[in-house]
Amino acid sequence: MLSVGRGIADITGEAADCGMLGYGKSDQRTAGIHQRLRSRAFVFRDDSQDGDARLLLIVAELPLPMQNVNEEVLRRLADLYGDTYSEQNTLITATHTHAGPGGYCGYLLYNLTTSGFRPATFAAIVDGIVESVEHAHADVAPAEVSLSHGELYGASINRSPSAFDRNPPADKAFFPKRVDPHTTLVRIDRGEATVGVIHFFATHGTSMTNRNHLISGDNKGFAAYHWERTVGGADYLAGQPDFIAAFAQTNPGDMSPNVDGPLSPEAPPDREFDNTRRTGLCQFEDAFTQLSGATPIGAGIDARFTYVDLGSVLVRGEYTPDGEERRTGRPMFGAGAMAGTDEGPGFHGFRQGRNPFWDRLSRAMYRLARPTAAAQAPKGIVMPARLPNRIHPFVQEIVPVQLVRIGRLYLIGIPGEPTIVAGLRLRRMVASIVGADLADVLCVGYTNAYIHYVTTPEEYLEQRYEGGSTLFGRWELCALMQTVAELAEAMRDGRPVTLGRRPRPTRELSWVRGAPADAGSFGAVIAEPSATYRPGQAVEAVFVSALPNNDLRRGGTYLEVVRREGASWVRIADDGDWATSFRWQRQGRAGSHVSIRWDVPGDTTPGQYRIVHHGTARDRNGMLTAFSATTREFTVV
């Protein structure tokens, strides 16, 4: 018998002038909110086991998981609950949206486009994750947990088919359309009510382009919002909803949601929002359909966790394609990584695949450094990350690997972006060791930390973006397979595993310039709505405001759409809603304007409405003053 607790909380960081994380573009900085980012936590407790056996699963709408975030979350949870939640039984996975603020990372590389570490965004993420766990911890109660699987086509496409085609026929035959359609739904019921779901599917969080400046949970964020808010009627500002839906990743390293190809800069501005909604709806519909086919997940929970120095693993021949003993190498970025992807181009002068200049340089280096050649060739090396790592933590080398079990479901926690065939090999290996059905074993990427990509040794040879971003060389996947096999064998045999050596503490660097004191007639409405609107039209208003970063309003909102009901005004939308957008623009050196848009939904009740803006101004002494402003009334007919 399992008991389950659920919790949700806001983790939205700085909505103004903060570098966004995902595409690696320094000029892609936050300038508002389309949808808020959220953490969803699930506590599973096995009531049939002695003691207090628990598993904590957190799905966070973040670009990347980070070691320093995990460490601070676990430190805070230890202050609250002692040793109830630990590295071993806590799995934190990111949805990999490319539309979230960055600067929260402990390793310098990921903060280069954000002017370094951003304490406010880091705090919002940690505070929100911890809050979601607090809600889940308090919510634990007996539940019926069931499991189902499906197939979803039309929500992903292989963005590196030439690399995929290098795999052996047996692997390619498993994915005849070059995509991984496998979906999994964990359903949580209490009595007659479904109170929570966790859906797993492989597709990238790149429906929003690198030209977007609004915070968004991308397609998985929309899927969760649609089920909770649109279908379930959740009011996130009023407390914990009765139903919580998390949409998690599996192995989407080479999976793109842009099934019609990347959007060109000339595409209509609303196209990326349409793509986000469409791919999110596909995932929601798949999950909703599976509700009727779920069967009991089974008894028991278990977890194994270890750290591995991924740059110095001696891999036994049983885990390599040719049966030969191999060794991984220290992290190095290839020219293919610098090129970026078709949907997010990188630096000028680089291309995916072969780069003759860098290939020639690397061949010369390989002749002088045979161990490096054995690990990294044919990568055209552009940046050996080991060198900056000696000066300051730049990328992570000692990484966490995890295996957890909920009933008959096994989750392999990988701290990177596995391609679909890399994930398949990990799944097959665990399934064979523990005696599980392959469908019940998932490779969950973006878990607990981040090491970039995980390709198969065959895909690596193509040196597309994914291969160039497989930092530890051609045998990285093989090293992870060896480590995961040890965890699976220990779980099967009921043995503990050694934790291994933890990564050294990171040191945050920041060169963010302090913002000037705000100036202006705060709250003045400089563009009022029209008098009358119909469903399908857009209401817009512009306010004199202040820097949104003065108060992130975590758990709150920068805007409200309110409707007159008798003598009162009732909130019917906020800045977390799909129908609203909140845009910030700097005016001069210290001024701010905020534009608020509400796309009137088709089912909107006719009546009198207003738009309300909430802001906070900071003076020269650092004193904060909250203000609110309201438009004139307008009518929806």
From Swiss-Prot:
Gene3D superfamilies: Neutral/alkaline non-lysosomal ceramidase, C-terminal domain. Its EC number is 3.5.1.23. It is an enzyme of class 3 (hydrolase). This is Neutral ceramidase. Pfam families: Ceramidase_alk, Ceramidse_alk_C. GO terms for biological process: ceramide catabolic process; long-chain fatty acid biosynthetic process; sphingosine biosynthetic process. GO terms for cellular component: extracellular region; membrane; peptidoglycan-based cell wall. Zn(2+) binds at H96, H204, E417, Y453. Its cofactor is Zn(2+); Mg(2+).
